[in-house]
């Protein structure tokens, strides 16, 4: 039980009990407005307001006590407490708090506040489970038949059966309401299920609900439990879905499904349904009640196990009395038949995933009873390995069982405490490769490739003189001769050697200046924080972001809006914005911090929300760095009571609740008053409607050159070109005669795309064809040379020409012939060297075959190798992996080599850093901090971001990078293959992700790899409320949380192996959960297949086309 603050006079403080079942605010001055109404038939709980004098008074409806009206509302909502307008929360210690202005509080007020916070609060700190359900945002409205009666209230208690109760305490400060004269049918006094007849003459129906396909039967009757009868099935099952994700009981979802869809039993003309057995209920209650206990709740009374029957009653057939786990029929039945496999963890997976060498169950139970052939090693996890992978220093089994009790060659290897042998070069390299960390004992900093602080602490060399004090004694920022003057006002953002966007247009900036000299204010452009009481900010912010662009794609910019809709703290969004876009003092040009009290309240009330889903409060938001509001020498920010709670990224319900904007008009009511699902037509929302699938588009997406409708109707009828003109991809018109002439006339260069192709006739010959003036022309062979064949093959993105033949052409063909002085034209494209002619003197045309460029090969990799769960990768296994680096920051993002001069990465890596001169790309390295003999470095020449990249939804997150020079292709540096356009991966395909990323709180020096399974987009969307999953994205991971995506950095590859050992790039690590988990879902990758045309087009334009000279 924690300490909380009150905003009432001491004389009026009473031992009040929270009225809203399931959750209380930290302040008991106002009962909670965000309580859990899951699975319970209760109405809208009112709130005890505060009178002007500070005493406990009437609720919003004027009713004294705990109900918001004299009559129980039958259409109670799962989100009623969530949806009610939050009462003013306690933050101020004085009435002078105001409008985001700097606050300086006097000692008397502070003493008053300290006195008040010592008063013990009777309410629970927070109902974590309620917040979790709200966090995912799926709590819906629930309807109950209450016979128009009120819930029974006696002795200061609201006796509402079926409620997930919090601890009850006597309320001596408010009169009790009179008992209700009629008792709702769903109270404990209502007839129990044992007394009710299950007979039914209705027809059995098939179970179609996707989640409940795990049931071992396929037909059901109408729900039997009163609570299920009067509640939408989807809403009922949400409660069990989240308990399932918390892993409290492996069959909790099965239990919920058996309640929602009771088994239909046919007995002659009679039909009756089977509810779960009492033992099943007791097992579910035993497993999950402890989770509910964490939030001061208990197993719902409406699901009390005493109402269910024993399977041994009357010594009759148990299968016709109640539904049990039926272990005697095998576990398979619990997952819906022979097509599924039931993991020990309770997860149901496709049977085809069993015994495939992958940890799909998260507990290896799908691999536990698999047989290995005699020539293979059987891992403790059940996996089968080639014996050459045993005792090689790499964890191939996933549990290190292949590396136990090995005979180490002590001249070349180090023996870990568990018997594992690792390479000698891994000793003192900065990574803990031994489980017991014995490989990093008694190591000097230089031996690990690190720099030693004065205190003896080791840090990477790139951390020196970077503006951040990484050494605890600050010695890494001393004697920095090339460092500019210190940042004013304690700013810790002297992170870049050149002025960034925040300094653009400032007279303080020049080519030699630094962020430390940029002290002016800039307008707030971060959408989340556009409704603040101030409109100027100063960077870097308090989370270390150097620009607003960087802040907009940060994890925190997604975290805080998601937390806002949990109602964990009224002023959370205000606090978030004060650290994301700090207020800029126009007089000093310095940041104005939030007050420490605001930070502490935000953290106290919302940190536990993150804890239940395995996340931590952002570590950079240490409240001790912010001043007390009573400080005499520094001002700080506190919010006004009427500060806007909803950010521009939220939709504000009529009730005042904030829901994510992405959930507006999504077909499911998230507002307690359903206002988010009103006026949802495209025209009503001023959007354009696709004719085929009725998809709504912003008008800015119409006729922009990128099809968005499934039938591309948004790009039709966009321009009206003359008969002698052709339409560019961006709907400009150019003269027909200029099409494919080697000079770009369309502003998007589309008049020069795909001009050279190979076409087949009846035989096997491939004829060279040029699409001039919108007509295909054959190329006359007169004067042809091999260098022209090479140019043609390169222009089509192929390898060297293998065959060039002169073949007799046909009568009536359209001909192009070489320009008489083509050798002097210095042309970069084939079409530029050709001119239109009516005939070809020889009558021969060019037949050409080009080789395919070799890609996706790994000559240095050891084959037959699988690594799970994020293990260190062997050198040479991923020769296309590269590191995108900048000075002085070092490694920033991963990248992928796709051609000798071209790499791919994600667009958001360049947010605020789009100058190619500050970047370089490093190839052929496994350990970032140790140079390799295979390493190659190239500077960046050109950065091409996708024009439709949106940082708001991180869509179209891809960029093409041109290198200054070609790489030298070796066994350790080679390009990966690109997929065919629109070649999509099937669900349950296994692929690899690689990168350096982060593991825990440190970045590993060695390249990491892990296997992930492709997850359907519709399933993926269910994990993400803040973002919309589009077909430009791929979802991959494990629902069970096997692979840790913390290890993978942005821009790293997702590659899949084709038959024959060739690897193809299908994804680039873009965004997703901070780490894979049951609650947070998979990682999201840019779908390379969708962008292949665009990628090849950019390479073609940069390589071959030249802009038509003006004038």
From Swiss-Prot:
Q: Where is the active site?
A: 908 (charge relay system), 957 (charge relay system), 1050 (charge relay system)
**CDD domains registered for this protein in UniProt:** CRD_corin_1 (cd07445), CRD_corin_2 (cd07888), LDLa (cd00112), Tryp_SPc (cd00190)
Keyword Repeat present in the record's keywords: the answer is yes
Q: What is the name of this protein? A: Atrial natriuretic peptide-converting enzyme
Q: Which family does it belong to?
A: Belongs to the peptidase S1 family.
- Please tell me the species this chain comes from: Rattus norvegicus
Q: Where is the FZ domain?
A: 199-325, 516-639
Q: Which residues are glycosylated?
A: 147, 296, 409, 535, 763
Q: Which residues lie on this side of the membrane: Extracellular?
A: 134-1111
**Entry's transmembrane regions:** 113-133
Cite the ranges annotated as topological domain Cytoplasmic. Answer: 1-112
List the residue(s) that the UniProt entry marks as the site Cleavage: 866-867
Q: Which GO terms describe its molecular function?
A: endopeptidase activity; serine-type endopeptidase activity
Modifications after synthesis and translation: N-glycosylated; required for processing and activation. Activated through proteolytic processing by a trypsin-like protease; cleaved into a N-terminal propeptide and an activated corin protease fragment. Atrial natriuretic peptide-converting enzyme, 180 kDa soluble fragment is produced by cleavage by ADAM10. Cleavage by ADAM10 to produce soluble 180 kDa soluble fragment takes place after the transmembrane region and before FZ 1.
């Amino acid at each position: 039980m924690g300490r909380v603050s009150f905003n009432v006079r001491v004389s009026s403080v009473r031992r009040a009990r929270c009225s809203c079942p399931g959750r209380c605010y930290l302040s008991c001055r106002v009962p909670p407005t965000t309580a859990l109404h899951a699975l319970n038939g209760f109405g809208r709980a009112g709130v005890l307001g505060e009178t002007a004098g500070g005493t406990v008074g009437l609720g919003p409806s004027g009713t004294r006590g705990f109900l918001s009206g004299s009559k129980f509302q039958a259409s109670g909502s799962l989100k009623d407490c969530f949806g009610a307008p939050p009462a003013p929360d306690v933050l101020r210690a004085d009435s002078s708090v105001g409008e985001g202005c700097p606050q300086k509080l006097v000692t008397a007020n502070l003493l008053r506040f300290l006195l008040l916070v010592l008063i013990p609060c009777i309410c629970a700190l927070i109902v974590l489970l309620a917040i979790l359900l709200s966090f995912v945002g799926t709590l819906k409205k629930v309807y109950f038949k209450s016979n128009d009666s009120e819930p029974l209230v006696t002795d200061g208690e609201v006796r509402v059966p079926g409620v997930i109760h919090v601890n009850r305490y006597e309320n001596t400060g408010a009169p009790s309401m009179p008992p209700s004269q009629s008792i709702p049918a769903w109270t404990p006094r209502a007839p129990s299920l044992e007394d009710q007849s299950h007979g039914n003459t209705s027809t059995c129906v098939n179970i179609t609900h996707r989640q409940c396909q795990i049931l071992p039967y396929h037909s059901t009757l109408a729900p039997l439990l009163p609570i299920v009868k009067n509640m939408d099935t989807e809403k009922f099952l949400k409660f069990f879905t989240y308990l399932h994700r918390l892993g409290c009981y492996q069959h909790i979802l099965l239990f919920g499904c058996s309640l929602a869809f009771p088994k239909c039993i046919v007995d002659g003309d009679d039909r009756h349904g089977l509810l779960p057995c009492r033992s099943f209920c007791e097992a579910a209650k035993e497993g999950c009640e402890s989770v509910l206990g964490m939030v001061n709740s208990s197993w719902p009374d409406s699901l009390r196990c005493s109402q269910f029957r024993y399977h041994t009653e009357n010594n009759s057939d148990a299968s016709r009395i109640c539904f049990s786990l039926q272990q005697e029929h095998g576990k398979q039945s619990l997952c819906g038949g022979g097509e599924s496999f039931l993991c020990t963890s309770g997860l149901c997976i496709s049977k085809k995933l069993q015994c495939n060498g992958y940890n799909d169950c998260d507990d290896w139970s799908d691999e536990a009873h698999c047989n290995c052939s005699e020539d293979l090693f059987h891992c403790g996890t059940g996996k089968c390995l080639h014996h050459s992978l045993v005792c090689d220093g790499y964890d191939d089994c996933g549990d290190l069982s292949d590396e136990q009790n090995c005979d180490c060659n002590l001249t070349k290897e180090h023996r870990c405490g568990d018997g594992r042998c690792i390479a000698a070069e891994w000793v003192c390299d900065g990574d803990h490769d031994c489980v017991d960390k014995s490989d990093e004992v008694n190591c000097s900093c230089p031996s690990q490739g690190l720099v030693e602080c004065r205190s003896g602490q080791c840090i990477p060399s790139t951390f020196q003189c970077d503006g951040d004090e990484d050494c605890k004694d600050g010695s890494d920022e001393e004697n920095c001769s090339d460092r500019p003057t210190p940042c004013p006002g304690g700013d810790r953002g002297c992170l870049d050697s050149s002025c960034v966007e925040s300094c653009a247009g400032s007279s303080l900036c020049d080519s030699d200046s630094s962020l430390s000299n940029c002290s002016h204010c800039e307008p707030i452009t971060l959408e989340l924080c556009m409704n603040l009481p101030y409109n100027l900010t100063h960077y870097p912010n308090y989370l270390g972001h150097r620009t607003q662009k960087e802040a907009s794609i940060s994890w925190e910019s997604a975290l805080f809006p998601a937390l806002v809709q949990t109602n964990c703290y009224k002023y959370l969004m205000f606090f978030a914005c004060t650290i994301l876009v700090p207020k800029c003092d126009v007089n000093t040009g310095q940041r104005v911090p939030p007050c420490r009290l605001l930070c502490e309240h935000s953290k106290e009330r919302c940190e536990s929300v993150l804890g239940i889903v395995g996340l931590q409060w952002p570590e950079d938001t240490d409240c001790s760095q912010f001043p007390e509001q009573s400080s005499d020498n520094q001002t700080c920010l506190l919010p006004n009571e009427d500060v806007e709670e909803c950010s521009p990224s939220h939709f504000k319900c009529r009730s005042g609740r904030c829901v994510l904007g992405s959930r507006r008009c999504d077909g499911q009511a998230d507002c307690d008053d359903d206002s988010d699902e009103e006026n949802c037509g495209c025209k009503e929302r001023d959007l354009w409607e696709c004719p085929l699938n009725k998809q709504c588009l912003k008008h800015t997406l119409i006729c922009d050159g990128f099809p968005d409708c499934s039938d591309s109707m948004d790009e039709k009828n966009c321009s009206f070109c003359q008969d002698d003109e052709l339409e560019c991809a961006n709907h400009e018109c150019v003269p027909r005669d200029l099409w494919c002439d080697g000079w770009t006339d369309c502003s998007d260069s589309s008049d020069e795309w795909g001009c050279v192709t190979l076409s087949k006739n009846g035989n096997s010959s491939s004829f060279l064809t040029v699409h001039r003036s919108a007509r295909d022309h054959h190329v006359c062979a007169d004067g042809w040379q091999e260098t022209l064949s090479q140019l043609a093959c390169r222009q089509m993105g192929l390898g060297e020409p293998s065959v060039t033949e002169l073949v007799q052409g046909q009568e009536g063909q359209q001909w192009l012939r070489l320009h008489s002085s083509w050798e002097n034209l210095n042309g970069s494209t084939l079409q530029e060297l050709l001119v239109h002619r009516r005939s070809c003197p020889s009558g021969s045309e060019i037949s050409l075959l080009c080789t395919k460029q070799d890609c996706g090969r790994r000559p240095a990799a050891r084959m037959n190798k699988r690594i799970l769960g994020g293990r260190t990768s062997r050198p040479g296994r991923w020769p296309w992996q590269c590191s995108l680096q900048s000075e002085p920051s070092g490694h920033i993002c991963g990248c992928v080599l796709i051609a000798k001069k071209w790499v791919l990465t994600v667009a958001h890596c360049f947010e605020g850093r789009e100058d190619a001169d500050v970047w370089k790309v490093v190839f052929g390295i496994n350990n970032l901090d140790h140079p390799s003999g295979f390493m190659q470095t190239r500077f960046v020449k050109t950065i091409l971001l996708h024009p439709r990249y949106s940082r708001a939804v991180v869509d179209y997150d891809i960029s093409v990078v041109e290198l200054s020079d070609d790489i030298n292709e070796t066994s350790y540096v080679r390009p990966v293959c690109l997929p065919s356009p629109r070649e999509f991966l099937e669900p349950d395909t296994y692929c690899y992700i690689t990168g350096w990323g982060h593991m825990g709180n440190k970045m590993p020096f060695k390249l990491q790899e892990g296997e992930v399974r492709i997850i359907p987009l519709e399933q993926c969307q269910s994990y993400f409320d803040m973002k919309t999953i589009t077909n430009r994205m791929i979802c991959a991971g494990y629902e069970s949380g096997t692979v840790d995506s913390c290890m993978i950095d942005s821009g790293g590859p997702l590659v899949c192996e084709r038959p024959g050992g060739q690897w193809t790039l299908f994804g680039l690590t873009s965004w997703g959960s901070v780490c894979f988990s049951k609650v947070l879902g998979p990682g999201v990758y840019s779908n390379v297949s969708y962008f292949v045309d665009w990628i090849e087009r950019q390479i073609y334009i940069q390589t071959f086309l030249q802009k038509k000279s003006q004038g």
